[in-house]
């Protein structure tokens, strides 16, 4: 399915600022849909007059009347005359979709077309559809919602709503159903939804909201006087026609998220809307998660310290032993333990249980050169980015890469080689991480088989690749000289044995 940006690029020549404005409209129109109890479609017009639906939203507060997905559908100018008229006149119009062209589902819809103005030009038209047969007397809540929606739609037609700077704010704001308060131009509450009243009672309010000045009734409830003053300034700024504001406050042990929306028509303030949500339980869960994350990071830190202690003891024992074979085995163990310790070190500083593989590999490579048991100087390079991998598989992959590099250092070069080179080549796609460990040495021995090799390092590699990484591994000579070890690992969390 094409995105809004794709459809705008395909069918229009709108400048970047207009495209950003339409993205901002889409960022806010779930609120419009919920306030209007209506489905919304966004239409743009091609040079030949054909209308293209580029976005669609359905309400959370009412049943949808548009059962089909209309995004990408085309309509002629005569199919939706109310939309064509809105493009040409720049004014809000009303009509009916008797043939069902706009909905692609059923006829008999009441359609209101609202021009979206940006820098004085109509760049799109929003239509919101409601069923003609479902008109009835509205409740006070529905009336307050519809009045606010009407004000916002007129601001949309004037080009004063939304503000592009509010796009990020809209993604984390309270929803209409969480709690809604309507203020008049003097800052007095003219309507408060039941959820908004409950949120204020949670804050410690013992009286009703209706008829009271919201700033005066809210300030005493907030624990921090600086937060209270900041919220008061936000509300006053919105009443004066300023920008939308979002703020979280603590009151009487409750965490409350508020967003203020200025309502302005023709340059005159109509008051403000306040969306409010009780996020006390959400904050409690966030704190619990942060505590668990800190505990996990502390565990990784202690594991790293213990592994470093083990590596130090093995290194000390390697220095004291007189048996060369035992010394080499101990040094290999030091390298393996150090590799795992570096992964836990990275996890101890990560907040999302993911490891930057490039950073860990770059720290391991110098260590491998230091503990190499060959006299030939070896240069180790990394080309490309390994990227980030989840903690479950990062340790196994780091172990595999270090074993393959160590195997190349120890077995790829003969004593006459002046200098060897081992290169780690990484290429990452959406599904796969491909790693090639290349050396410019003498190539594989005659009759060598990866599956039948009795080298401990390669046995470890085979086990990790198949059992832990669900990947594939291959080794072959390179015509220009040397050997390539090719490793492919799925990036997604696939079950073992998945194709």
UniProtKB/Swiss-Prot annotation:
Family annotation (InterPro entries): H_kinase_PdtaS_GAF_sf, HATPase_C_sf, His_kinase_dom, PdtaS_GAF, Sig_transdc_His_kin_sub2_dim/P, Sig_transdc_His_kinase_HWE
A biological process term (GO) from this entry: phosphorelay signal transduction system
Superkingdom of this protein's organism: Bacteria
UniProt-recorded Gene Ontology molecular function terms: ATP binding; protein histidine kinase activity
Region span, GAF: 4-149
Enzyme Commission number(s) of this protein: 2.7.13.3
Reactions this protein catalyses: ATP + protein L-histidine = ADP + protein N-phospho-L-histidine
Loss of function: phenotype: Knockout mutant is severely compromised in growth on amino acid deficient media and exhibits global transcriptional dysregulation of biosynthesis and transmembrane transport, leading to a loss of lipids and increased membrane permeability. Disruption mutant is more sensitive to the wide range of aminoglycosides (kanamycin, apramycin, sisomicin, streptomycin and dihydrostreptomycin), but is more resistant to tetracycline antibiotics (tetracycline and penimepicycline), drugs affecting 30S subunit of ribosomes. Disruption also affects respiration and electron transport.
Entry comment on modification after translation: Autophosphorylated.
PANTHER family noted in UniProt: ETHYLENE RESPONSE SENSOR PROTEIN, TWO-COMPONENT SYSTEM SENSOR PROTEIN
Protein name stated in the entry: Sensor histidine kinase PdtaS
């Amino acid at each position: 399915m094409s995105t809004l940006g794709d459809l705008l690029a395909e069918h229009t020549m709108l400048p970047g600022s207009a495209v950003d404005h339409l993205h901002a409209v889409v960022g806010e129109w779930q609120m419009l849909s919920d306030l209007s109890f209506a489905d919304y479609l966004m239409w743009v017009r091609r040079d030949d007059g054909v209308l293209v639906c580029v976005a669609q939203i359905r309400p959370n507060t009412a049943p949808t009347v548009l059962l089909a997905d209309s995004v990408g559908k085309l309509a002629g100018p005569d199919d939706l005359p109310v939309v064509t008229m809105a493009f040409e006149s720049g004014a809000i119009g009303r009509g009916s979709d008797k043939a069902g062209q706009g909905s692609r589902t059923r006829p008999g819809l009441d359609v209101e077309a609202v021009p979206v103005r940006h820098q004085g030009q109509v760049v799109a038209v929003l239509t919101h559809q409601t069923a003609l047969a479902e008109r009835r007397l509205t409740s006070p809540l529905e009336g307050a919602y519809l009045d606010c929606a009407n004000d916002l739609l007129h601001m949309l037609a004037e080009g004063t709503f939304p503000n592009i700077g509010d796009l990020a704010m809209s993604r984390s704001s309270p929803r209409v159903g969480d709690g809604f308060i309507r203020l008049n131009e003097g800052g007095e509450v003219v309507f408060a939804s039941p959820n908004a009243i409950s949120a204020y009672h949670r804050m410690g309010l013992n009286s009703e909201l209706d008829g009271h000045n919201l700033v005066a009734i809210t300030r005493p409830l907030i624990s921090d006087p600086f937060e209270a003053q900041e919220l008061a300034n936000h509300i006053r700024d919105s009443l004066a026609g300023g920008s939308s504001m979002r703020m979280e406050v603590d009151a009487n042990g409750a965490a409350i998220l508020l967003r203020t929306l200025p309502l302005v028509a023709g340059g005159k303030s109509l008051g403000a809307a306040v969306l409010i949500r009780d996020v006390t339980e959400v904050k409690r869960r966030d704190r619990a998660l942060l505590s668990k994350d800190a505990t996990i990071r502390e565990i990784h830190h202690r594991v790293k310290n213990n592994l470093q202690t083990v590596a130090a003891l093995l290194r000390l024992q390697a220095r004291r032993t007189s048996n060369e074979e035992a010394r080499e085995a101990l040094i290999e163990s030091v390298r393996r333990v150090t590799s795992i310790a570096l992964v836990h070190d990275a996890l101890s500083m990560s907040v999302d249980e993911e490891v930057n593989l490039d950073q860990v590999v770059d720290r391991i490579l110098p260590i491998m050169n230091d503990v190499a048991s060959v006299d030939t100087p070896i240069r180790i390079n990394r080309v490309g980015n390994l990227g980030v991998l989840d903690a479950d598989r990062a340790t196994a992959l780091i172990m595999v890469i270090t074993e393959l590099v160590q195997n190349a250092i120890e077995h790829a070069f003969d004593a006459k080689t002046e200098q060897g080179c081992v290169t780690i080549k990484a290429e990452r796609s959406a599904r796969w991480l491909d790693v090639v460990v290349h050396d410019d040495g003498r190539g594989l021995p005659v009759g060598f088989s990866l599956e039948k090799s009795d080298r401990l390092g390669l046995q470890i590699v085979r086990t990790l690749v198949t059992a832990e990484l669900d990947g594939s591994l291959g080794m072959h000579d390179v015509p220009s000289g040397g050997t390539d070890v090719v490793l492919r690992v799925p990036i997604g969390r696939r079950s073992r044995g998945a194709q």
